[in-house]
Swiss-Prot record:
It comes from Shigella flexneri. The lineage of its organism: Bacteria, Pseudomonadati, Pseudomonadota, Gammaproteobacteria, Enterobacterales. GO terms for molecular function: amino-acid betaine transmembrane transporter activity; antiporter activity; choline transmembrane transporter activity; spermidine transmembrane transporter activity. Belongs to the drug/metabolite transporter (DMT) superfamily. Small multidrug resistance (SMR) (TC 2.A.7.1) family. MdtI subfamily. Its main location: membrane. This is Spermidine export protein MdtI.
Amino acid sequence: MAQFEWVHAAWLALAIVLEIVANVFLKFSDGFRRKIFGLLSLAAVLAAFSALSQAVKGIDLSVVYALWGGFGIAATLAAGWILFGQRLNRKGWIGLVLLLAGMIMVKLA
């Protein structure tokens, strides 16, 4: 694997942002009834995976995937709260904390 460079972290950050955008567009698509948002969601997912493919050139796949998934979930929760008024219950918060702890453990392993 190539030596870590910040450009790979930037690709990972872009992949995370695009995943969040895809999830928000998916919500706006209302089950693909609003086709433009559904298509935008699909385009964002494709772009996210393209960015992810660049990130794994300089960061281990296991680390990239854990960070992408974890930050994507956490940020999507935040977007759901801000944009749609969705809230987590106690079990949801515990799950989020466990998710973040798992991401840290994968990074430190």
